Amino acid sequence: MRPLIVIGNWKMNGSLANNQDWVKTVARGMESGMPSGRKYAVCPPFPYLQQCADLIKGHSLAFLSLGAQDASAYGSGVYTGEVAAAMLKEFGCTCVIVGHSERRQMHQEVDEVIASKALQVLDNSMTPVICVGETADERNSGRAQEIVCSQVAKQVGVLQDRLVDCLIAYEPVWAIGTGKVASAQVAQDMHRAIRLQLAEFNEDVASHVGILYGGSVKPDNAVELFAMPDIDGGLVGGASLSPQDFLAICKA
């Protein structure tokens, strides 16, 4: 059975003071116990990784893991501004987001680069969270599943059997940061299409890979989303900045 996974993506938010309050509040909320068979992680900006690692350890937060928002496609070398997966591993990261739509749009990242990043993450014994999704224009033209399944197929072509150690996050671009959200059934339909695309390669891999939903997940829609058979949790953006909302989603 696939575990339900909730990952908070702070994007370019946070501060030393706010991070302390966030972890303290989440620790207090998790003390009363969490639903069994679930996993949780938070991905702060790079400069806060050490602080958050120390805070998580200091509060004995066994339920919460540390993740990162990106990693370089290269192992080391003359790549100014890049952060290697091996460096993230040293901070205690267990998962790394790759291919987020904001990276695809703002930094022109293509599927081949994203697959290279995923390989770097895997080679350093962490879990890549590979993001896929369609724009509003692509959905309105009836090409949503075609676009997303093409993105998945390109990852399959590079990662092959190693996909079993990855997570996929479906993030409809039109729903990110807009307050819009795909209905639970629309999200389920896409998650099912992704799993069928994976099954064309390997049915066992398809049955084991967790597929998260990442489009404006909030406390008031998390229960319905997480009840869907092919939705295995959420990649949570804006709502993860509120420790109360993050806790509510984790317990949904």
Swiss-Prot record:
Pathway: Carbohydrate biosynthesis; gluconeogenesis; Carbohydrate degradation; glycolysis; D-glyceraldehyde 3-phosphate from glycerone phosphate: step 1/1
Catalytic residues of the enzyme: H100 (electrophile), E171 (proton acceptor)
Keyword field: Cytoplasm, Gluconeogenesis, Glycolysis, Isomerase
GO molecular function, one term: triose-phosphate isomerase activity
Entry-linked Gene3D superfamilies: Aldolase class I
Biological role: Involved in the gluconeogenesis. Catalyzes stereospecifically the conversion of dihydroxyacetone phosphate (DHAP) to D-glyceraldehyde-3-phosphate (G3P).
Binding site for substrate: N9, W10, K11, G177, S216, G237, G238
PROSITE patterns: TIM_1, TIM_2
Reaction catalysis annotation: D-glyceraldehyde 3-phosphate = dihydroxyacetone phosphate
Keyword Zinc: no
PANTHER family with a match to the protein in the record: TRIOSEPHOSPHATE ISOMERASE (PTHR21139:SF42)
GO annotation, biological process: gluconeogenesis; glyceraldehyde-3-phosphate biosynthetic process; glycerol catabolic process; glycolytic process
Enzyme Commission number(s): 5.3.1.1
Tagged with keyword Cell membrane: no
Family: Belongs to the triosephosphate isomerase family.
A single cellular component GO annotation: cytosol
Native species: Polynucleobacter necessarius subsp. necessarius (strain STIR1)
Quaternary structure and interacting proteins, as annotated: Homodimer.
Protein name, entry field: Triosephosphate isomerase
Compartment(s) of residence: Cytoplasm
InterPro entries: Aldolase_TIM, TIM_sf, TrioseP_Isoase_bac/euk, Triosephosphate_isomerase, Triosephosphate_isomerase_AS
First-tier enzyme category under EC: isomerase
A Pfam family matched in the record: TIM
